Amino acid sequence: MTDNIYPNALHADSTEPIQEDTNQEASLEYPQEATLDTGKPILLIVEDNEEIQKYISESFADSFEVLTAYNGEEGKQQALNRIPDIVVSDIMMPVMDGITLCRQLKEDVQTSHIPVILLTAKDSLQDKEEGYEVGADSYLTKPFSASLLRSRINNLLESRKKLIAQFQTQSVPDNQADLKEKRIVIAEALSKLDNEFIEKITLLIEENLSSEKIDITYLSDKMCMSGSTLYRKMKALTGLSTNEY
């Protein structure tokens, strides 16, 4: 990660110093969640302040394929087009704010699995409650350091990796009690939409195992999404491609 100078624009709203924990951050490594294009995980930054957007983009360019948008509407379209591994969004933006963006991403089965970190200029309990109510996974109050954001992103992606590990081992449990327990853990960790998605595609595959018509095109049509979107969602939730699943 690049050590960029924190933009002056972020200091205007706070007089509190930035707390850096260099020892902790130095030991963190990003999970390698491959993408279809670059082999890097995809980070979508939705931020209308050009300085802040540039600061985050340059800080993570070495470890992520970085996408940017200047408002929630642009961010939503980027998310639908590319299905990023994680979204970092400001709250106060023109056209569509970050709360609305988060809500719409979490309510769309194509993007409901994507972790969202919201950035806010004020440490307001009301703002945080509203964000968590629409499915935000984490919050950061400006000003923040790139290393702190890195830690949040890393933790969210590591949590997803652990869930994937649970998912991949549930088919070979020691006994039925273990299988039931693992399924409960997975179900509790996923949203309602993502649980319904897994149940639907599992049923589709099981019902058509002997059919010649079952392929990526058939499954993507039945799941009402493109083949590439289905691939990325399956990889994000299970660690397996559609064919492997």
Language-model-detected regions and their locations in the chain:
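C-terminal output helix
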Residues: F144-I153, L157, A165
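Acidic, metal-coordinating helix/loop segments flanking the phosphotransfer/catalytic sites
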Residues: T68-I86
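Conserved acidic carboxylate
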Residues: E47
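Receiver (REC) domain active-site loop signature in two-component systems and cognate sites
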Residues: M93
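Charged docking surfaces used in two-component/phosphorelay signaling
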Residues: K54-E58
